[in-house]
Swiss-Prot record:
Recorded superkingdom: Eukaryota
Gene Ontology CC entries for this record: nucleus
GO biological process: cell differentiation; regulation of transcription by RNA polymerase II
Regions of compositional bias (Polar residues) in chain numbering: 201-214, 230-239, 246-273
Ranges annotated as biased composition (Basic and acidic residues): 215-226
Family of the protein in this entry: Belongs to the ETS family.
Keyword Nucleus: yes
Stretches the record annotates as Disordered: 201-273
Protein name (Swiss-Prot/TrEMBL): Retroviral integration site protein Fli-1 homolog
DNA-binding region boundaries: 282-362
Gene for this chain: fli1
Matching PROSITE patterns: ETS_DOMAIN_1 (PS00345), ETS_DOMAIN_2 (PS00346), ETS_DOMAIN_3 (PS50061), PNT (PS51433)
The keyword Transcription regulation is assigned to this record: yes
Length: 453
């Protein structure tokens, strides 16, 4: 009876161990003792207890315990899975906008197993190798040695080399310091970093060294050069010449001069057209425009801008040339300036106040002066061309032209001169024997006009 109960308990205990994962290694010893005290007819105890499945069931809880013990020992709650051992983690970010983070192990007592976490060291360098300092180059070499397992590299040969010099080194320069295998690895990774920084649009001017920044910012035109993108070198503060497509100039005064158009190109054709007097005689203002239309006369007269203002740089020479044109050898600037005042009232030109020998053309006034004015044709017409004037002697017709008094002046047949003059053949004769002369109706011109003569 006692043997049957023990056998049943042994079977139940063994079945529970298959499904209950809370049973640990300490419970197996008691189970084995219970089985050993049972009837030996059931065979060996290890054949009844499924020990291999129990090992599989308890494997995972043991791993969790290992992680927790590690966290407790180091005082950190970071999971060891977050740390990479075999490969470096490259991160873009950090304190600077573009930086690479390299992670490698500190080997103290030999290389650790690949499934265990060790203390790691991070190296943060700029993304562009050309901006590396000497310390960055050294850290990069140390990382490459740890990462790729490189040997036979003398780091002392790279002590005084910064990022610029490193990028300029050729394959032969690397071969002088290390083997061909190490050279291929280092150059491949260096080229990869350079290509990555260029694809990210990395701005090399933003990370120049402090000395070059101070030197460049002392010049006030540095900002204009940097913003316009004309700075081709990181160390040179000012470029000598901007590109063809540039829209800003380094020198502000030069920018203003280049922005103003050439007055001779703008006012030259207008000056030549207005200076042409045609068939008539040339006037003084036209002569001045003739001189201003040619830039070779700038030694004596020149434009001041494009608004019509000009200045006589040599007024005596201008007066002498005007005297030669008009055949007046005694011409001087005083006489010429008095002649110019005549054009003030005609709105052809004005005197620029505050400037000596400076005048200004009024092209609107010149256009008004050159327009043909409509003349009164009545001043040039004969009286016979008007409908209300019948003859050349209008004063005789006005004597009897009284619209308010329809009755005519009573006269005798003998006329004003008494007896008939022998010069007149008939009383009806008049001074206009031609019948084609236009006459007004009889109400205005009486038929007795012939009796007056």
């Amino acid at each position: 009876m006692d043997g049957t109960i023990k056998e049943a308990l042994s079977v139940v205990s063994d079945d529970q161990s298959l499904f209950d994962s809370a049973y640990g290694a300490s419970s197996h010893l008691s189970k084995a003792d219970m089985t050993a005290s049972a009837n030996p007819d059931y065979g060996q105890p290890h054949k009844i207890n499924p020990i291999p499945p129990q090992q599989d069931w308890i494997n995972q809880p043991m791993r969790v315990n290992i992680k927790r013990e590690y966290e407790h020992m180091n005082g950190s709650r970071e999971s060891p899975v977050d740390c990479s051992i075999n490969k470096c983690s490259k991160l873009i970010g950090g304190s600077e906008g573009n930086a690479m983070t390299y992670t490698y192990m500190d080997e103290k007592n030999g290389p650790p197993p690949p499934n265990m976490t060790t203390n790691e060291r991070r190296v943060i360098v700029p993304a562009d190798p050309a901006l590396w300092s000497q310390d960055h180059v050294r850290q990069w070499l140390e990382w490459a040695i740890k990462e790729y397992g490189l040997v036979e590299i003398d780091c002392s040969l790279f002590q005084n080399i910064d990022g610029k010099e490193l990028c300029k080194m050729s394959k032969e320069d690397f071969l002088r310091s290390t083997s061909i295998y190490n050279t291929e690895v280092l150059l491949s990774h260096l080229n990869y970093l350079r290509d990555s920084s260029s694809s990210l649009g990395y701005n090399t001017q933003a990370h120049t060294d402090q000395s070059s920044r101070l030197t460049a910012k002392e010049d006030p035109s540095y900002e204009a050069v940097r913003r316009s993108g004309w700075g081709n070198s990181m160390s040179s503060p000012v470029t000598k010449s901007p590109p063809m497509g540039g829209t800003q100039n380094v020198n502000k005064s030069g920018d203003q001069q280049r922005s103003q158009p050439d007055p001779y190109q703008i006012l030259g054709p207008t000056s030549s057209r207005l200076a042409n007097p045609g068939s008539g005689q040339i006037q003084l203002w036209q002569f001045l425009l003739e001189l201003l239309s040619d830039s070779s006369n700038a030694s004596c007269i020149t434009w001041e801008g494009t608004n019509g203002e000009f200045k006589m740089t040599d007024p005596d020479e201008v007066a002498r040339r005007w005297g030669e044109r008009k055949s007046k050898p005694n011409m001087n600037y005083d006489k010429l300036s008095r002649a110019l005042r005549y054009y003030y009232d005609k709105s052809i030109m004005t005197k620029v106040h505050g400037k000596r020998y400076a005048y200004k053309f009024d092209f609107h006034g010149i256009a008004q002066a050159l327009q043909p004015h409509p003349t009164d044709t009545s001043m040039y017409k004969y009286p016979s061309e008007f409908s209300y004037m019948p003859s050349y002697h209008s004063h005789q017709q006005k004597v009897n032209f009284v619209p308010s008094h329809p009755s005519s002046m009573p006269v005798t047949s003998s006329g004003f001169f008494g007896a008939t003059s022998p010069y007149w053949n008939s009383p009806s004769a008049n001074i206009y024997p031609n019948p084609n002369v236009p006459r007004h109706p009889n109400t205005h011109v009486q038929s007795h006009l012939g009796g007056f003569y």
